[in-house]
Every structure is written in structure tokens, then in C-alpha cells.
């Protein structure tokens, strides 16, 4: 695995795009190697987990509210919302909002426990929504989700190594 050193910079540093974190993440995401079968299976299970939790929260107020907001932004060839007819499409950012809210509402999806915790499954709704709208294939979706997991888990480990916790902030 490639190691990327991350540190804060002043806005005035005006880093070259190749030195910015977003660029480094894009390099990871665009890697041409095929993930191992165990990784592919894990991602498929995480997608099922996310969709299941979203359906379980389908009638809860936050999920209903986010879904209503998303439905106000229809888009031909857009993205789907968990639990609705797959012919109904909305702009990807709104599908990500509705699906992400539904997944997070019950907070039953995967958790990465280190010195702190995070939910790398939170990456799935936006990546899925963009992949749908862009017409990506299944392997592109899997690689996008793997990238989201890899980056989030490693950032959490890095933050935990310096005794930072979001739970203690005011």
C-alpha cells in the first residue's frame, strides 16, 4: 500500500494540485489494479448492509424529510433513492443526501473502532449516487467504495495517533 503523508497547510501556501490531498485521493481512486475477491465481497456486503439500514429507517421522520427534499430535484439519468421505484431518478447530490440520511438515521451500519470511531459506510451513498448518474460499471463503484474506506480508515488511524478525538471538542 502506498503511504501518503498528510499535514495541515496555510491557505496562502497555494500548493500545486499534485500535492493536495484531493489529488492524492484521486490517484488512489484511479488506480488500475483489480481488487482482490475478498475486497469485492466485502464491498458487496457493505452495500447490502447500507441498503438494509436505509430500508429499516424508510418511514422515520429524518429519512422521509430528506427523501421529500430529494424528490424535488428530479433528473433524467440521475440516481435512485433506496426503497423507491428504480425509475424515479434525482440529482446525485440529492440521492446521496436522502440515502445517506436514511442510512445514518438508525446508526446501525458498520463502525470502524480505533482509538476513536467512524462509519466508513457513510461513503457508500454519495459514491453510489455519483456512479449511477455517471453510468459507471460495478467494478468502478466497488473501487470507489474501497477508496472511500481506505482513505477514511487511514485518516482516522492518523488522527487517533496524535490523541485527537472529535468527541472532546466543544
Language-model region placement:
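N-terminal core-entry segment
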Residues: 2-167
Amino acid at each position: 500500500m502506498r503511504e501518503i503523508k498528510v499535514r495541515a497547510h496555510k491557505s496562502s501556501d497555494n500548493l500545486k494540485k499534485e500535492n493536495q490531498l484531493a489529488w492524492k485521493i484521486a490517484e488512489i481512486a484511479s488506480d488500475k489494479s483489480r481488487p482482490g475477491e475478498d475486497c469485492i465481497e466485502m464491498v458487496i456486503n457493505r452495500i447490502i448492509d447500507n441498503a438494509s439500514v436505509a430500508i429499516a429507517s424508510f418511514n422515520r421522520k429524518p429519512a422521509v424529510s430528506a427523501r421529500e427534499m430529494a424528490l424535488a430535484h428530479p433528473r433524467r439519468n440521475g440516481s435512485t433513492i433506496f426503497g423507491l421505484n428504480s425509475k424515479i431518478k434525482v440529482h446525485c447530490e440529492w440521492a446521496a443526501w436522502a440515502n445517506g440520511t436514511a442510512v445514518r438515521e438508525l446508526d446501525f451500519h458498520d463502525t470502524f473502532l480505533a482509538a476513536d470511531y467512524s462509519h466508513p459506510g457513510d461513503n457508500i451513498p454519495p459514491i453510489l449516487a455519483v456512479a449511477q448518474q455517471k453510468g459507471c460499471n460495478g467494478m468502478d463503484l466497488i473501487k470507489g467504495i474501497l477508496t472511500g474506506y481506505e482513505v477514511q480508515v487511514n485518516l482516522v488511524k492518523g488522527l487517533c495517533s496524535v490523541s485527537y478525538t472529535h468527541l472532546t471538542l466543544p
